[in-house]
């Protein structure tokens, strides 16, 4: 029955995604001028993703081979292993890694494929009405969201079914064999987000600084040689990268929850059996609640609509509230159905996760929408120049990390104690796992909102480049400003769910040490080696961020140099703006090629850093521990310190960078909206000094 429900719900998800895709493709694809712009975006996005996936393929094969060797030949076996034959263990872990990596690549490609076909239809929809464009953009994002969530559920459930069918191990140990699926998904997501992120921001910086600030031309102006690269970046970074990111989050957290569920059932087997609760229901509980959440999100997507007078963000929020409410109902049914008399506390844990997700959405909107104080304060700071804009943005970003951390902390402690008081032994971790599942319950709708951002951004670019009427651009600008907020809140949502999951994964690391014969009940930071490990973890976050930002800067410099080269033959007016001649034809392909090569080149070093650092630290301090005759901290304890402090620092850094970027972007949009007034009542618009300062902050 459990498998029937999981696979049945997945079939509904696939059918709905196909329905949405066919509905979108049946819409008008606009004028001939629109189609020319769209074709250029398609070509650039597909070329980049093809080259990026080829690079990831080689890295994944190398890593999979290393995993097989380590598990099959280098690692000593123990009685807790799911299979006794080490070669068989290595083979299953390697295969699950490759399947997770492949599904993650497909998730990213799906996101990009649908987005580059939805953006032109959103632009064409804006010719009709704001509501038409809104519905097309959201449903395009939803098609991606449902396919990604379904692919995750099907991948894990399918692998579970195959291993169970061949009898490779007992049912309760199957989650240990599919752990590689989550690692494969994380591996691909890391490089997909790095490559896509570097591409996106480098193209954006190059297009804005030379186009808006130096040349004095509008955003997405067809005379800007970097504008196509900028629009391509929205697809490969925000659509493909985020699709792989959400897939990775769901995969890792579902598998982690299944492993914890297995341990919970084994430790409380008599209590479960006396209550008539079967092991499959407990093990597959994470997939079941995800399936309920997907169906709930389906309803949320279908009810979204607006009129010309309403703030379109209200329509998106309505859909999210409906999805959240129906997901809570799904949690109730799943807990009552599969957890027997222990259902109430775990249902409340799921509600904790859903409420946490809601709070994260509210907080991100508060810090990134220009309807609220933080973004407006940055716009006000722009009146005195770029320096004060940057100072104000950094201050807002730092402030924005406080309340989310308090929210995560409250969610972890509440869910843990609800689990502990459920009547089952050692159920605190499972309570936290269920809260994490609650946060991910509306993942399909959240991913729809995330993809809404780059789709509307591209639609605005297509409208501008095809020289549509100003009234059409006003509609896409309104949707684009919303998209900046939805992108930011989705990233905040991902950080929040990762924060809850980090607690689970760290506990899983300690369990693995216990199974391997090196139990570690606590991490003692008073030991100098462990303290050093913690400092190295925090350093890793800053070093990784430095490499990523430097990569963006390096790639952006190349783009800026190319755009300036193409503008060099043009005259400048007394105002400093460039005077364009009728025969000037920008070379879009040159900028696309430059930023593609730079992104693929620059993504390897930061990616390798985060993969190799824990291994190097563990091996180094293991050698030091052995050389000291067993005195001091073991290498595994030092790595625990690195993971613990590194995770905490990473959460804070992610919140800071995400909200700062979203706030700067919408501060610029606020100035461009024509509603920004200084204390004297003077309106500041595009091309004003305040706008130029806001553009610097945005880039």
Language-model-detected regions and their locations in the chain:
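Hydrophobic packing and interface segments
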Residues: 1-699
């Amino acid at each position: 029955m459990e498998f029937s429900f999981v696979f049945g719900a997945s079939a509904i998800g696939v059918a709905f995604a196909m329905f949405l895709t066919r509905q979108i493709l049946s819409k008008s694809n606009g004028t001939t001028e629109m189609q020319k712009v769209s074709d250029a975006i398609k070509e650039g996005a597909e070329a980049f993703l093809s080259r990026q996936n080829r690079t990831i393929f080689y890295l994944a094969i190398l890593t999979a081979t290393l995993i097989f060797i380590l598990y099959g030949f280098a690692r000593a076996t123990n009685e807790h292993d799911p299979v006794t034959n080490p070669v068989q263990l290595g083979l299953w872990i390697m295969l699950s890694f490759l399947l997770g990596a492949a599904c993650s690549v497909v998730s990213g490609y799906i996101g990009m494929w649908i987005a580059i076909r939805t953006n032109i239809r959103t632009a064409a929809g804006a010719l009709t009405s704001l509501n038409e464009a809104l519905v097309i953009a959201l449903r395009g994002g939803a098609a991606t969201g449902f396919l990604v969530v379904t692919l995750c559920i099907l991948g894990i459930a399918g692998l579970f079914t195959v291993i169970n069918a061949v009898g490779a191990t007992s049912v309760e140990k199957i989650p240990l064999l599919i752990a590689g699926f989550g690692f494969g998904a994380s591996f691909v997501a890391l490089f997909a987000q790095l490559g896509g992120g570097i591409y996106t921001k480098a193209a954006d910086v190059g297009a804005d600084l030379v186009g808006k600030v130096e040349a004095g031309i509008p955003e997405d102006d067809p005379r800007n040689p970097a504008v196509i690269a900028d629009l391509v970046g929205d697809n490969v970074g925000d659509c493909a990268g985020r699709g792989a990111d959400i897939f990775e989050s769901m995969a890792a957290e579902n598998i982690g929850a299944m492993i914890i569920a297995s341990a919970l059932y084994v430790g409380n087997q008599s209590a479960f059996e006396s209550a008539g609760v079967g092991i499959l229901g407990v093990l597959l509980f994470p997939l079941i609640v995800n399936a309920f959440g997907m169906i709930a999100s389906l309803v949320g997507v279908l009810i979204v609509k607006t009129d010309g007078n309403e703030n379109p963000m209200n329509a998106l929020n309505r859909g999210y509230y409906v999805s959240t409410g129906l997901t809570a109902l799904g949690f109730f049914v799943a807990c009552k159905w599969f957890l027997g008399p222990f259902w109430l506390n775990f249902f409340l844990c799921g509600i904790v996760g859903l409420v946490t997700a809601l709070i994260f959405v509210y907080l991100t909107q508060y810090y990134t929408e220009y309807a609220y104080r933080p973004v407006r304060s940055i716009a006000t700071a722009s009146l005195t120049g770029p320096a004060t804009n940057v100072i104000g943005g950094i201050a807002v970003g730092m402030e924005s990390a406080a309340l989310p951390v308090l929210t995560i902390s409250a969610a972890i402690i509440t869910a843990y104690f609800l689990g502990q008081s459920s009547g089952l032994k050692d159920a605190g971790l499972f309570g936290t796992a269920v809260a994490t599942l609650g946060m991910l319950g509306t993942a399909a709708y959240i991913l729809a909102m995330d993809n809404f951002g780059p789709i509307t951004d591209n639609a605005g670019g297509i409208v501008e480049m095809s020289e549509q009427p100003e009234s059409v651009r006003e509609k896409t600008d309104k949707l684009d400003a919303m998209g900046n907020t939805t992108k930011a809140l989705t990233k905040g949502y991902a950080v929040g769910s990762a924060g809850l999951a980090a607690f689970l994964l760290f506990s899983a690391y300690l369990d693995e040490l216990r199974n391997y014969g090196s139990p570690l009940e606590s991490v003692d930071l008073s030991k100098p080696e462990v303290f050093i490990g913690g400092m190295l973890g925090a350093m890793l976050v800053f070093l990784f961020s430095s490499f990523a930002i430097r990569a963006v800067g390096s790639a952006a410099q190349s783009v800026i140099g190319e755009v300036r080269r193409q503008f060099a033959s043009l005259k400048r007016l007394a105002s400093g703006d460039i005077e364009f001649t009728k025969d000037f034809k920008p070379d879009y392909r040159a900028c696309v090629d430059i930023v593609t090569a730079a992104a693929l080149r620059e993504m390897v070093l930061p990616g390798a850093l985060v993969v190799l650092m824990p291994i190097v630290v563990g091996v180094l301090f293991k050698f030091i521990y052995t050389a000291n005759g067993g005195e001091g901290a073991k290498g595994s304890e030092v790595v625990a310190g690195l993971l613990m402090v590194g995770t905490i620092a990473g959460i804070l850094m992610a919140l800071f960078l995400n909200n700062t970027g979203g706030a700067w972007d919408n501060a610029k949009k606020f100035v461009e909206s024509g509603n920004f007034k200084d204390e004297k009542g003077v309106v500041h618009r595009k091309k004003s000094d305040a706008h130029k300062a806001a553009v610097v902050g945005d880039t």
